[in-house]
Amino acid sequence: MGEPQQVSALPIPPMQYIKEYTDENIRKSLAPKPPVPIKDSYMMFGNQFQCDDLIIRPLETQGIERLHPVQFDHKKELRKLLMSILVNFLDMLDILIRSPGSIRREEKLEDLKLLFVHMHHLINEYRPHQARETLRVMMEVQKRQRLETAERFQKHLERVVEMIQNCLASLPDDLPLPDGTVSVKTEPMDVQEPCTDHHEGPQGAAASVKEATIDKDAAMCGIIDEMT
């Protein structure tokens, strides 16, 4: 008889997959293709499973005797199983003390095994509810984090707008330019008003407004540089 097959409880280290999916392999179409979906059965942890099996299989399909009714209260049944396990464990200790070689020892072991199987089965029936609750909590946490991030962004935006408004309000009209010259008071020119010089026309007025805006931008940059 051959050696029993060793079954690992952990997946293969991911580096064995990563090295196959490098940028060069993907560019040259050398990366392995996704495996074909399994249609019939598969092996997991040394046991064979069918693709159409239920996530939580009934006890009868596994050849295990059912101790609780079909319609029941999970909490009550779990409490009953817990008490039964405790009583059977004490009986097991009594048997080991009085007659360790008795056949009742094996019977009591089977009873304990059946009780533990039922307890794990009832706990596993809570898994879908646990998954939904975990997903709900995770989504609530993500929602709260995004709302807090948006609120922080809004506060920073309001602070920046306030700082810019205060800086603009504190700018003098005759602020010196970076080259040492003094800028005269400039006001945005309304392009709708007629120009005094008929040779400049609308283009000259727009250029004057642009130059005035550039002067203020340069002065603002100088103030910011001094602040930092």
Swiss-Prot record:
An example Gene Ontology biological process: regulation of transcription by RNA polymerase II
First-listed, main subcellular location of the protein, grouped into a coarse class: nucleus
GO molecular function: transcription coregulator activity
Pfam families: Med7
Gene3D superfamilies in the cross-refs: 6.10.140.200
GO CC, any one term: mediator complex
Highest rank taxon of the organism: Eukaryota
Key words of the record: Activator, Nucleus, Transcription, Transcription regulation
SUPFAM superfamilies for the chain: Mediator hinge subcomplex-like
Protein function: Component of the Mediator complex, a coactivator involved in the regulated transcription of nearly all RNA polymerase II-dependent genes. Mediator functions as a bridge to convey information from gene-specific regulatory proteins to the basal RNA polymerase II transcription machinery. Mediator is recruited to promoters by direct interactions with regulatory proteins and serves as a scaffold for the assembly of a functional preinitiation complex with RNA polymerase II and the general transcription factors.
PANTHER family registered for this protein in UniProt: MEDIATOR OF RNA POLYMERASE II TRANSCRIPTION SUBUNIT 7 (PTHR15498:SF72), T-CELL IMMUNOGLOBULIN AND MUCIN DOMAIN CONTAINING TIM (PTHR15498)
Oligomeric and partner information: Component of the Mediator complex.
Name of this chain's protein: Mediator of RNA polymerase II transcription subunit 7-A
Organism: Xenopus laevis (African clawed frog)
Gene: med7-a
